[in-house]
């Protein structure tokens, strides 16, 4: 897809309105392949909420290929759970943690939550996720690369905070995150070390959108 088409579809005035666009393709190594495009047209490696939306769309437990790897999933009518492929801490920094949850996140403790987020995003060329306390549910805010603004509920950002929480509290296997949207998600580690994200997904609408030269 051309970046201009993605930007148009994600535009909240002239298009459908979204933080990103998901394209599904056949896969040779999983049930299907997910490609995720940011609102500016750039392609991202992974999206935690995007993975869960795909499972909701298919209405079954499936394996999903993305640029980040293979994600497992569990489908129920009420909640969707997915794994974040190869999620790990890249490096501990003086200011926080650099973490890969399919996409890179800089995780910082900041009582002001969003202060200097844009600066850190460009200094490190990453998504920036800030938290104000490690008391659960952990309140977070994310400045997303490609969106170039706040994402009200970033699944991979929540996963990054869960990894930082696990690093600080090794005996804890469950972490609940509260997003700026007011929604929450639960993150847990299974016996193999895989990081699972679980939460509710709502079907908002469906329709047909026609792209043409005049759009």
What are these regions (language model features)?
Residues 1-77, 99, 106-215:
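A glycine-rich beta-to-alpha transition motif near the start of alpha/beta enzyme domains, typified by
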């Amino acid at each position: 897809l051309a970046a201009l088409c993605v930007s148009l579809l994600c535009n909240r005035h002239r298009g459908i309105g979204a933080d990103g666009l998901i394209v599904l393709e056949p896969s040779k190594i999983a049930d299907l392949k997910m490609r995720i495009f940011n609102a500016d047209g750039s392609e991202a490696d992974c999206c935690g909420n995007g993975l869960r939306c795909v499972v909701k769309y298919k209405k079954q437990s499936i394996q999903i290929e993305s640029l980040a790897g293979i994600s497992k999933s569990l489908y129920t009518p009420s909640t969707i759970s997915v794994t974040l492929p190869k999620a790990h801490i890249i490096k501990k920094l003086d200011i926080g943690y650099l973490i890969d949850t399919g996409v890179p996140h800089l995780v910082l403790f900041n009582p002001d939550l969003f202060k200097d987020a844009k600066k850190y995003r460009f200094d490190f060329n990453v998504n920036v996720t800030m938290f104000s306390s490690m008391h659960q549910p952990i309140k977070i805010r994310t400045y997303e690369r490609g969106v170039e603004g706040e994402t009200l509920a970033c699944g991979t950002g929540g996963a990054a905070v869960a990894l930082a929480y696990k690093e600080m509290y090794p005996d804890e296997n469950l972490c609940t995150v509260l997003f700026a949207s007011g929604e929450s998600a639960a993150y847990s580690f299974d016996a193999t070390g895989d990081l699972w994200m679980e939460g509710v997904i709502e079907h908002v609408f469906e329709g047909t959108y026609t792209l043409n030269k005049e759009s």
